[in-house]
Amino acid sequence: MSEPIALTDDNFSDEVLSAELPVLVDFWATWCGPCRMIAPIVQELSSEYEGKAKVCKLDVDTAQKTAAEFGIRSIPTLLIFKEGKVADQLIGAVPKQQITEKLDASLSN
């Protein structure tokens, strides 16, 4: 079972912006209830999309620079990056189907 990649301010560029595959980034925090609600979904997606897309998690408390750079104001926020740019976003504890629809769309474009 594949684990989401833990992102930091230091590895964000290499793991996300330079990635050849689309990347789903979950901006979250340990104290955030809705973030804990979608954590199992993000975990599942990491395995389901292995080899097709990267799935990562960024703790906004420990990677404040990156969170600020992307204007993260509400968490959880899920950003989908393609070719180093934000291709789509979801804000809040959204259903898995909504995430997979957006992720699948990024794979087909």
Describe each PLM feature range:
Residues 21-22, 39-58:
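Conserved helix-turn-beta segment immediately C-terminal to the redox Cys motif
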Residues 4-23, 64:
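A short beta-strand-turn-helix
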Residues 3, 8, 28, 54-56:
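Conserved Rossmann-like nucleotide-binding pocket used by diverse enzymes
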Residues 27-41:
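Conserved redox-active cysteine motifs that mediate thiol-disulfide chemistry
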Residues 82-109:
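Non-catalytic, surface beta->alpha helical segment in thiol-disulfide oxidoreductase systems
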Residues 60-67:
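Structural microenvironment flanking redox-active thiols in thiol-disulfide oxidoreductases
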Residues 20-21, 27-31, 74:
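Short pre-active-site segment immediately N-terminal to redox-active cysteine/selenocysteine motifs
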